[in-house]
Amino acid sequence: MHLVVDIGNTDIVCGFYTSEGWQVHLRTPTHQPWTAIRLEHWIQKELTEKGFENIVVESVLISSVVPPVLIQIQKGLTF
């Protein structure tokens, strides 16, 4: 599965993609006190609630217009 992250001024959107298409989308406000651990826990919680557990992420693509948030997101997306 591939993870695509868009860090915008309003929201952070995470999409999980396979050869069969988009599997799940997650959305949260950008301007929160994001830390790497908090991001990791949020993604795990959201995926579990949507029925996606123990997924294997093969690659990550990040797009960002908010550099301070990008640093924490990169730390949190270390697989």
Regions found by a protein language model. Give the residues of each.
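Short, well-ordered alpha-helices that flank and scaffold nucleotide-derived cofactor binding pockets
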Residues: 18, 45, 75
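Short hydrophobic alpha-helix segments
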Residues: 26-28
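A short acidic/small-residue loop/turn micro-motif
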Residues: 30-32
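Short beta-strand-loop/turn "lid" adjacent to the catalytic site in phosphate-handling enzymes
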Residues: 50-79
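Short acidic, gly/pro-rich beta-turn/loop elements at beta-sheet edges
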Residues: 24, 36-38, 72
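Gly/Thr-rich phosphate-binding beta-strand-loop-beta motif of the actin/hexokinase/Hsp70
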Residues: 1-23
